[in-house]
Amino acid sequence: MNTFFCRAFQCCFAVGAHFLPWRRPKVYAGPGSLLRAADILRENGLRRPFVVASRRQCADEHFRALQETLDEQDILLSIFSAVETDPSVETVERIASQYRLDRCDCFLVIGGGSPMDAAKAAAARLARPEKTVPQLGGLLKVRRRVPPLIAVPTTAGTGSETTIAAVVTDGHHKYAISDLCLIPRYAILDPTLSTGLPPRITAETGMDALTHAVEAYLSRFYNTGMTRALAESAVVAIFAHLERAYRDGASLDDRAAMLQASFDAGAAFTRASVGNMHAIAHTLGGLYGVPHGLANAVLLPLVLEDYGAAAYPRLAHLAGLLGLKGDTEETRAKAFIAEIRAMNARMNVPDRLDCIRDEDIPLMARWAAQEANPVYPVPVIYDEARFARVIERARRGV
């Protein structure tokens, strides 16, 4: 009955999705493209940008160059640089309050997933002042025009610069605010901003992008020709460039390719959705503070294996794009999963998450099921018991 209800919901949502106003940000890409933010502000008559960025980014030479350009144009910045990993409801409220106090007119977000999530959630809160942040959680709860968002990713992973989602942590529980109005108007993909990333962060965020692409590609009802093409492009690019970026952090070509792959994967899952990996990963981040990319890197091969034959045809196709061989769909699909594991190992990504406590697994399974069902159009609908089995496998690494 649960599976029937989920599939019925997904079919209806897929029909309705064709009538939603999907859009993609206008993109500026290439080394030094951060300075295009000044042009964007000037062309749109925006004079008081609210910057959300880490202290490290604010001290970076590229940001200082942008700041000097904006000073020459008498554009006054308000800066918030206190976003924690996994932004909290309290941080979102602080950003919204300071934005109002400083009478800002847009957001300029420079950073990884946490600053992006915090700024987008604050934008939702500003658009809906009568609602609390938790009340905005879920799908299409905002439905108002938000302040203009200019997104500048410094990691190649979340794809938040093109997605509808902002993930917030409330206590030990993570949830997403998802609405089309949260898709940024502009995305700036400047590879010079990501050359200083540590190898571990490069690996984990890159595997997050791969998870986005694969989950979008496996989507049963929400997929379109465009999302399939974007997901395929992202998968091929990630396998070609992620390990090279991991080994040589200064390679602008590989950093640029990964930023584009992350953007493509984000655009794919914005329309086609994520899946059960993300449902579990959010519980790991909320309960234990496990970095989102690390959680997805560990979960991706485990869940793909658990899907079994339901995922073989599409995984086999992805394997073919990578030049992996096999006589049957099953052997090609398993070769693709094996290649994910091999890439994880080459980048020193662990194969288990031993922070998971046995007594927490039922709660994690319940949270994951509540997030995934009925919305996520996964190859196999999981109930709480099946989520619990996969979480146990993630704990043991088998």
Summary of predicted features, one role per range:
Residues A272-R341:
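C-terminal catalytic subdomain
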Residues M1-C106:
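ATP/NTP phosphate-donor binding region
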Residues P31-G32, S54-R55, V83, I110-G112, ...:
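Fold-independent oxyanion-binding glycine-rich loops
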Residues E90-S97, L101-T192:
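Glycine/threonine-rich beta-strand-loop-alpha-helix active-site module
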Residues L34-A37, A59-H62, V89-V92, S114-A119, ...:
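Short glycine/serine/threonine-rich phosphate/pyrophosphate-binding segments
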Residues C6, L315, K325-V398:
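C-terminal charged capping/lid subdomain of soluble metabolic enzymes
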Residues A165-A272:
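Carboxylate- and glycine-rich phosphate/diphosphate-binding segment that chelates Mg2+/Mn2+
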